[in-house]
């Protein structure tokens, strides 16, 4: 029987979560969904000084917005301390680990001497028990660390699903501290215990974890566990070619929501940020899950391109359901001071959305319907509301008032009749109408705008001429 696929996302809640971070959730989520497996969320919160509840909330909020549903969790490492201590003791009992009494000062001096000799700084195994080796008495009053007995000689080898075969000599690895003097376990040890207990089969994570992998594999093997498949994703770079980070100006995932991006656009963009399916650029979440595999993960760093994300967002806005878009855009309109009353918002969205890259831009255009009475610039009024044009405006108002149906086509016909009667070009009449009705010179098609404003509002505002 084939083993059930189990993947995990294991963020540290020490800051906000950006696109590069959330990609390490999206890919294992998609792989688990494609393989009919399980996706687990684990919060690695052992860095007590830097971990915050706010950061945990942001992780959960970001995943909820993108609808990256989990099958198990969230599990918190701080709630599993007893389990880690239990395994540390098992390793001590089975002589897989040992107590090391070397002080910080002694370790610093050792490393300094190694550097001076041109050697790689590392622990020298002084307190490591070996057959025939006589250890000194433990110094009084010193709380030891616990070190893992890393294999001596040989290599750690694994076939990374992204990077290919990787081989690290065990001579490059010293005996890792797995528990501090106060008994708290260290990061690499907790990760191994969690992955074994949670039966993780595939570890899909950023390539900043490659250096941790040989140590984790050695501990897994010492504990008799099965080594998972590792897939280390290349770094995501910002526009300047630097590693994406808060320090280098990266937005948190929730920041894209707040700027008016749609989750489906962000996911589509993330899908292509290090993975490809032929030349396909636009595809749904369901298509991505169907197509996703580890074989087509990119090996080179992926660079963030805001123009590409904006293009995708524009696509999803254009094809999006107008009722849903109206619900999502309403808060942006209200944030601009608009009152959504009068013109039907769903119809307004349908009219204005096609050129918008974000819901914020949709809201900014839609504001012409919801900002209240128009306050046109006096200079513009003087330029466009001339004595010459007023008779045509009055004739248009008469035509509009007599329309049997307030429909765009009928409004357009009324304009054409007045233009023909007065020998005018469309801009000569449309500009003052825009100023009077909308308070601005730039709007979508004037007949569509007037239809949405409604007959009463249009006639009342034209009367101000």
UniProtKB/Swiss-Prot annotation:
MF terms from GO for this chain are: ATP binding; glutamate-tRNA ligase activity; tRNA binding; zinc ion binding
InterPro entries in the record: aa-tRNA-synth_I_cd-bd (IPR045462), aa-tRNA-synth_I_codon-bd_sub2 (IPR020751), aa-tRNA-synth_I_CS (IPR001412), aa_tRNA-synth_I_cd-bd_sf (IPR008925), Glu-tRNA-ligase_bac/mito (IPR004527), Glu/Gln-tRNA-synth (IPR000924), Glu/Gln-tRNA-synth_Ib_cat-dom (IPR020058), GluQ/Sye (IPR049940)
Q: Which GO cellular component terms, listed alphabetically, does the Swiss-Prot or TrEMBL entry include?
A: cytosol
* Localisation: Cytoplasm
Which branch of life, at top level? Bacteria
Q: Does the keyword Phosphoprotein apply?
A: no
UniProt keyword annotations, A-Z:
Aminoacyl-tRNA synthetase, ATP-binding, Cytoplasm, Ligase, Nucleotide-binding, Protein biosynthesis
- Per the UniProt entry, the Enzyme Commission number(s) are 6.1.1.17
Q: Which reaction does it catalyse?
A: tRNA(Glu) + L-glutamate + ATP = L-glutamyl-tRNA(Glu) + AMP + diphosphate
The UniProt entry annotates the motif 'HIGH' region at: 11-21
Query: What Pfam family is a match, any one?
Result: tRNA-synt_1c
Q: Which GO terms describe its biological process?
A: glutamyl-tRNA aminoacylation
| 'KMSKS' region, short sequence motif: residues | 243-247
Question: Which Cys residues form disulphide pairs?
Answer: none
Q: Where does ATP bind?
A: 246
User: What enzyme class is recorded for this protein?
Assistant: ligase
User: What is the recorded function of this protein according to its Swiss-Prot or TrEMBL entry?
Assistant: Catalyzes the attachment of glutamate to tRNA(Glu) in a two-step reaction: glutamate is first activated by ATP to form Glu-AMP and then transferred to the acceptor end of tRNA(Glu).
The record's note on quaternary structure and interaction partners says: Monomer.
Protein family according to the UniProt entry: Belongs to the class-I aminoacyl-tRNA synthetase family. Glutamate--tRNA ligase type 1 subfamily.
Q: What is this protein called?
A: Glutamate--tRNA ligase
Q: Which organism is it from?
A: Cupriavidus metallidurans (strain ATCC 43123 / DSM 2839 / NBRC 102507 / CH34) (Ralstonia metallidurans)
């Amino acid at each position: 029987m084939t083993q059930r696929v189990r993947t995990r996302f294991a963020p540290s809640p020490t800051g906000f979560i950006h696109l590069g971070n959330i990609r390490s959730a999206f890919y294992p989520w998609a792989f688990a969904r494609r393989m009919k497996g399980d996706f687990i969320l684990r919060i690695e919160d052992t860095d007590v000084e830097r971990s915050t509840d706010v950061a945990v909330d942001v992780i959960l909020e970001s995943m909820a917005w993108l609808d990256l549903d989990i099958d198990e969790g969230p599990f918190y490492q701080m709630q599993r301390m007893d389990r880690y201590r239990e395994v540390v003791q098992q390793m001590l009992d089975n002589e897989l680990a040992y107590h090391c009494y070397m002080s910080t000062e002694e370790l610093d001096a050792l490393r300094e001497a190694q550097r001076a000799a041109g050697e790689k700084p590392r622990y020298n195994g002084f307190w490591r028990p070996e057959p025939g080796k006589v250890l000194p008495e433990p110094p009084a009053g010193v709380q030891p660390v616990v070190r893992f007995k890393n294999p001596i000689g040989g290599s750690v080898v694994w076939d990374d699903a992204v990077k290919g075969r990787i081989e690290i000599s065990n001579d490059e690895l010293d005996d890792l501290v797995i528990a501090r003097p106060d008994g708290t376990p260290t990061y690499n040890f907790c990760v191994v215990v969690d992955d074994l207990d949670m039966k993780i089969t595939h570890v899909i994570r950023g390539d900043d974890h490659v250096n941790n992998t040989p140590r984790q594999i050695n501990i897994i093997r010492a504990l008799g566990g099965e080594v998972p498949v590792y897939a280390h994703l290349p770094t995501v770079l910002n526009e300047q070619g630097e590693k994406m980070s808060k320090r280098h100006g990266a937005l948190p995932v929730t920041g894209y929501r707040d700027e008016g991006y749609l989750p489906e656009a962000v996911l589509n963009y993330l899908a292509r940020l290090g993975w490809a399916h032929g030349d396909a650029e636009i595809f749904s979440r369901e298509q991505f899950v169907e197509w996703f595999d580890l074989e087509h993960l990119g090996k080179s760093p992926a660079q963030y391109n805001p123009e590409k994300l904006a293009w995708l967002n524009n696509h999803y806005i254009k094809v999006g359901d107008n009722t849903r878009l109206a619900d999502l855009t309403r808060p942006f309109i209200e944030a601009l001071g608009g009152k959504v009353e009068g013109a039907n918002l769903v119809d307004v969205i349908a009219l204005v959305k096609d050129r918008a890259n974000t819901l914020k831009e949709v809201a900014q255009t839609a504001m012409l319907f919801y900002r209240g009475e128009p306050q046109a610039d006096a200079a513009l009024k003087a330029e466009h509301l001339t004595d010459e044009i007023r008779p045509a405006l009055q004739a248009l108002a008469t035509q509009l008032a007599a329309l049997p149906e307030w429909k765009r086509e009928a409004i357009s016909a009324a304009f054409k009749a007045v233009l023909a009667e007065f020998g005018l070009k469309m801009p000569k009449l449309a500009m003052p109408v825009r100023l009077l009705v909308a308070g601005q010179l730039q709007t979508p098609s004037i007949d569509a705008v007037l239809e949405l404003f409604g007959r009463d509002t249009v006639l009342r505002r034209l009367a101000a001429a």
